[in-house]
C-alpha cells in the first residue's frame, strides 16, 4: 500500500467489517446526541416510539424516521432564531452560517460550530488529497465568497493539505483567467458550467488553456456534469487537465469524490452513512446496479445534525472496488439526477441529465443549452435551444439530424430544435437551471 495516496491511510483502507462497526457506533452517537439536545429530534423519534437504546443494528437504523427539506423549512425562523429547535447547541456556540442556494425552494439555514466546520474541511481534504493535491500546488478559486457553502471548504482543505490558495473573489472572468496565467496556478475548483465558460472566455481573449495556462487539476462540484462522461471530456479537452467530481450539500457536507483513478465517486463511509432507497417501494437497495434515491447521515456535525436526510439524489452502487485500494464503496455514474427532477413529458419519464449527455457529446454544439416544456392545449411541447460553434454554422442541417436522432434514442422523445447565435444563451458562474418546465401546476 502506498500510504502517500491517502489522506488518512487507516480509515480509507479499513476492512469492511471494521468500517461497518465504526458506522454503527457513530450512528448511535449522533442519534443519541440529537435525541438529548434537540426538541425537534426528540419529538420526531418520540412520535416514532424510538430512543437511543433501540439502535443496535443497521436494521434498526432503517426504522429511524427520515427528514426532508420541507421539515427543516417549517421550523426555520422560530426559536432559537433563525434555525428553530433542530439546533443542538446554544446559539453562542454557533460560529458559521451558510444557506442552500434555494434552487428547489426556500433556502435552508445551516448552523455550524467551529468543530463542525473543521469536520467539513477535513472531509474535503480527503477528496483533494485523493485527486493529487499536494504542498506546492497553487490553487485558484474563481468563486464569489458568500453565504453559499460552494467552495469555502475547498479553500480551507487546500490550506490544510499545504497548498497555496488564491481567492478569485470579485474578479470578473477575464481577470481571473489573466491572474491564473500571471501566477501560474496549477489547480482550480468551480462548477462544470463555469469551467466550460471560463475556457470559452479564455479563447476569446487569445489564451488557449492547455498551452497557455498551467492548470492540471480541476475539482468540480454543484452540478452533475463532473460525472457525465461527455461533459467531463469537454472540460478536460478545453483545459488540458484532469477533472474530478466532488459532491456534497450544505446540510450534509462533502460526502463523495473521485480519486485519481476516475472510476466513480467514493463515498466517505468513515464520516457518512449513505443508504439507497427504492423510489417506488421504499425498500433498501444494497446490491449494485439498481438506482434509487440517496438517504444520508452525517456523523460529525453537532450544531445541526442531519440524520437520515432524504436528499432525493439518484445513485447506484458500483460492483467494482477501485484500483486505488480504498475500501470506501464506489457509486456508478455519480449523481444520476434527482428524484424530483425526473418529470413526465408526453407520458415518458425524462431526466435532464440525459439531455445534457446528448448535447455535450456533439462537438459542433457549444457548452450551453436550454430546455423548455410547455402545454399546447392538452399536449406537452418540448423545445431544446442550442448554439452551433461558429465554424460549423454551415452544417446546421446535419447537426440537427444527429441531435434529433440521439435525443430520440436516449430519451424516447421528439423535440423542437432551435439554433441560437453563439454566445446568446445565458451563462452562469454558479448552478445553472437549464430545464424550464412552464406547464401549469396541477393542484
Positions of predicted regions on the chain:
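Short helix-loop-beta connector
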Residues: 133-137
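Conserved AMP-binding/adenylate-forming
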Residues: 220, 225-227, 231-321
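Conserved S/T- and glycine-rich ATP-binding loop of Class I adenylate-forming
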Residues: 34, 100-103, 139, 188, ...
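Conserved helix-loop-beta element of the AMP-binding
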Residues: 138, 205-226
Amino acid at each position: 500500500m502506498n500510504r502517500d495516496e491517502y489522506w488518512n491511510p487507516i480509515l480509507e483502507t479499513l476492512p469492511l467489517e471494521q468500517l461497518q462497526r465504526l458506522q454503527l457506533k457513530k450512528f448511535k452517537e449522533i442519534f443519541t446526541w440529537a435525541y438529548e439536545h434537540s426538541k425537534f429530534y426528540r419529538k420526531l423519534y418520540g412520535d416514532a416510539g424510538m430512543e437511543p437504546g433501540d439502535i443496535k443494528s443497521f436494521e434498526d437504523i432503517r426504522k429511524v424516521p427520515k427528514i426532508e427539506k420541507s421539515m427543516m423549512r417549517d421550523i426555520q425562523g422560530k426559536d432559537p432564531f433563525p434555525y428553530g429547535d433542530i439546533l443542538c447547541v446554544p446559539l453562542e456556540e454557533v460560529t458559521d452560517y451558510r444557506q442552500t442556494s434555494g434552487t428547489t425552494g426556500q433556502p435552508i439555514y445551516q448552523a455550524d460550530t467551529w468543530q463542525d466546520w473543521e469536520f467539513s474541511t477535513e472531509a474535503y481534504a480527503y477528496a483533494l488529497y485523493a485527486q493529487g493535491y499536494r504542498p506546492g500546488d497553487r490553487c485558484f478559486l474563481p468563486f464569489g465568497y458568500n453565504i453559499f457553502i460552494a467552495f469555502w471548504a475547498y479553500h480551507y482543505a487546500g490550506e490544510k493539505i499545504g497548498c497555496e490558495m488564491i481567492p478569485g473573489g470579485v474578479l470578473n472572468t477575464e481577470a481571473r483567467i489573466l491572474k491564473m496565467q500571471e501566477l501560474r496556478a496549477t489547480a482550480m475548483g468551480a462548477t462544470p458550467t463555469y469551467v466550460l465558460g471560463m475556457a470559452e472566455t479564455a479563447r476569446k481573449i487569445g489564451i488557449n488553456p492547455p498551452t497557455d495556462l498551467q492548470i492540471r487539476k480541476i475539482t468540480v462540484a454543484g452540478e452533475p456534469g463532473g460525472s457525465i462522461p461527455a461533459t467531463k471530456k469537454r472540460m478536460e479537452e478545453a483545459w488540458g487537465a484532469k477533472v474530478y467530481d466532488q459532491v456534497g450539500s450544505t446540510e450534509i457536507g462533502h460526502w463523495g469524490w473521485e480519486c485519481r483513478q476516475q472510476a466513480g465517486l467514493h463515498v466517505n463511509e468513515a464520516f457518512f452513512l449513505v443508504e439507497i432507497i427504492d423510489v417506488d417501494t421504499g425498500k433498501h437497495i444494497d446490491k449494485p446496479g439498481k438506482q434509487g434515491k440517496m438517504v444520508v447521515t452525517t456523523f460529525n456535525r453537532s450544531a445541526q445534525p442531519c440524520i437520515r436526510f432524504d436528499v432525493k439524489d439518484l445513485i447506484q452502487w458500483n460492483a467494482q472496488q477501485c484500483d486505488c485500494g480504498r475500501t470506501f464503496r464506489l457509486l456508478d455514474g455519480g449523481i444520476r439526477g434527482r428524484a424530483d427532477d425526473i418529470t413526465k413529458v408526453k407520458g415518458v419519464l425524462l431526466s435532464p441529465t440525459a439531455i445534457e449527455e446528448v448535447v455535450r457529446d456533439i462537438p459542433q454544439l457549444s457548452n450551453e443549452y436550454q430546455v423548455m416544456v410547455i402545454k399546447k392545449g392538452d399536449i406537452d411541447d418540448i423545445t431544446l435551444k442550442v448554439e452551433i460553434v461558429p465554424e460549423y454554422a454551415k452544417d446546421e442541417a446535419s447537426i440537427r439530424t444527429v441531435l434529433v436522432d440521439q435525443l430520440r434514442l436516449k430519451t424516447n422523445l421528439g423535440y423542437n430544435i432551435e439554433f441560437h447565435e453563439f454566445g446568446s444563451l445565458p451563462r452562469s458562474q454558479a448552478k445553472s437551471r437549464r430545464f424550464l418546465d412552464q406547464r401549469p401546476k396541477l393542484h
